[in-house]
Curated annotation (Swiss-Prot):
It is an enzyme of class 3 (hydrolase). It comes from Danio rerio. This is Omega-amidase NIT2. Its EC number is 3.5.1.3. PANTHER family: NITRILASE-RELATED, OMEGA-AMIDASE NIT2. InterPro entries: C-N_Hydrolase, C-N_Hydrolase_sf, Nit1/2_C-N_Hydrolase.
Amino acid sequence: MSKFRLAVVQLHVSKIKADNLGRAQTLVKEAAGQGAKVVVLPECFNSPYGTGFFKEYAEKIPGESTQVLSETAKKCGIYLVGGSIPEEDGGKLYNTCSVFGPDGTLLVTHRKIHLFDIDVPGKIRFQESETLSPGKSLSMFETPYCKVGVGICYDIRFAELAQIYAKKGCQLLVYPGAFNMTTGPAHWELLQRGRAVDNQVYVATASPARDETASYVAWGHSSVINPWGEVISKAGSEESVVYADIDLQYLADVRQQIPITKQRRNDLYSVNSVQEG
């Protein structure tokens, strides 16, 4: 199958977990009704994003939120990339994405590898490492359409991760993320287009909708980028669902026209993983 429909859900996230889960279910079902075979939710879709919230909203996996994701994926018959939730395991907290198949089976969990620790003077300081621990493995899953690589937000800044995913056969990279009002306008689209062009893959990002009253204001603008680096679908700042038809024949054509995979100087350099999930 050379084409399939992808949906990205840009969800409004509140402090009420039950509301977030209910709204996520509704929008995922809406997306499936529009023919989406793969649906992506945003980072921290079940809770506010912030170091002060991670412990309060943390769950075990399996738990309440992942049970909702599993049931929704099965009911809709889709692959559901469950954004991320704060996960508690063994006394540690993680920022974790769970992916479910059309039968409701948990396919993979991706714990955010690169923690968001930044300090831009006069604009934003954020230290995920104050409360979270980093993941230690790569995360990929198979579908009948293509192989998919998973990252979370800050992971997109690290080109090596995307290169390894592409090298291992991924044709779609998904990044639930919550860039902010400083990094969003500067780097959000730039990084997505860069990862897509560098690796000649599709890239999809899912952000929470923007809430100006929140302690952490997300940029929004969830997007899908094609292997040529074009933005083929993009949300605004409000809650919405955006769709894109992923055309794997087009991907193959781009790779044939500009054959960088064959032209790489593997005798001079290489990017390899040392640990996998």
